[in-house]
Amino acid sequence: MGLQLVFVVEANKKSKTDWIYIKDTIDRFYKYEAAHLKLSTVYMDGKNKYLSKKKEVNLLLSQYSVASTNNVTKVIYCFDCDDYDSNPVDKEFLEKTQEFCKANDYEYVWFCKDVERVYLGKKVEDGHKNSEATRFKANKLINGVSQSRLNGKSISHNMSNILSVLDKYKPHLVRK
């Protein structure tokens, strides 16, 4: 049986910044066989476009299931928390996206307050996100990110739940 994990991320297809951090996380913390695990990405090009990506997600799902009736696809939406703790609009957005994921049987990964603060420990201005992600990958900075920072149980600053979510996919993903 093959497993496809479809990551739906906020970044756009050109920059791929979110995917750089997520893929480095998978490669750093998990063993997997590429023949049995397919990693796919859907780029939202902004978090507010999450509803418009269902068609693209469903296309990936159907393409993978056609290859073998034993193939399974799981969808993982990834969101920054932004100012959830001080801005009611951001808090409401998080609640709406969590409900959306639950209603569609999708996984929900959060980065608090954003993916850069989780992996780099600092806020990165929009114009520098691409260069910071490139530097992160080139310098293998994932090796300096602690598992505890990526294994959050509840939303808190500079944390994510990505490892908690990915741990559900044994035997396809096994912690190193």
Identify the residue ranges that each predicted region occupies.
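MIDAS-like acidic motif and immediate structural context at the N-terminus
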Residues: 7-12
